[in-house]
Amino acid sequence: MQIALAPMEGLVDEILRDVLTRIGGIDWCVTEFIRVSERLLPAATYHKLAPELFNGSRTRAGTPMRVQFLGSDPQCLADNAAFACTLGAPVIDLNFGCPAKTVNKSRGGAVLLKEPELLHAIVREVRRTVPAEIPVTAKMRLGFEGKEGALDCARALAEGGASQIVVHARTKVEGYKPPAHWEWVARVQEVVGVPVFANGEVWTLDDWRRCREISGVDDIMLGRGLVSRPGLARQIAAVRAGEEPEDMSWAELQPLLLDFWQQARRKLAPRYAPGRLKQWLAMLTRTYPEAVALFAEVRREQDCERIDQLLALSP
């Protein structure tokens, strides 16, 4: 069984990957998508979105990181994937699940689920171009509007050469609205001969248990559930090891929240750093009452030094 941290554009950047993987329980993580259209991207683009490439493609905690691409041109994607491998990418992941309208309008992400033949062509060309020892994996949703093409899309990915498929158990149109249709993950697993990961609507340990029972797969990718409950992967890992699954207390999370903020201040412009903190805090309010109180204090603050003080004073 493996537990993966989902690639969420605009949320799970290098800073949050660093913090969440240090908490434990995560077997591997994925970069935000690298968007490819018509040209070979420079090394600086990869290093900006995936600075872990300088650290053997691992986070500070030693968690392996995969490089994810998004686009619709098979040859361009393949060329960029091959270049990423020369920079140290250990696994190439392909995004066929992003539901964002701006991405879909430019023929990226979930809109490609309308074209299983193109999915196959993309994976086949990337698989043909990158070194044989580099795995090529893919992430998909159940479809764009309906689910009737889900199995065809999954087959296209597997037959094209994907060695692993993550299934976000909703369509593009469903977005992030509950429920996630975990029973469809089971159907996908039945028609492909590669490992399948379940993804979507796993917020708690009980959600994970239900997902595993309904989907029939052991492997899980956690996204918003892990961001809002940072100890969730550690809890799941404890259960699978036969240990007591202790939740993460606010007191244990506080130093990591402060470290997240300090990294944001160092790496981002002062006008952007507060927004990143507020984004994570807002998600933490789902789990921690203390986060509700702290978020209420910082939500209108743009002064970084004042936020320093509020974080230092928070109980």
From Swiss-Prot:
It is an enzyme of class 1 (oxidoreductase). Disulfide bonds: none annotated. Its EC number is 1.3.1.-. The keyword Flavoprotein applies. The keyword tRNA processing applies. The active site is at C98. Belongs to the Dus family. DusC subfamily. This is tRNA-dihydrouridine(16) synthase. The lineage of its organism: Bacteria, Pseudomonadati, Pseudomonadota, Gammaproteobacteria, Pseudomonadales. The gene is dusC.
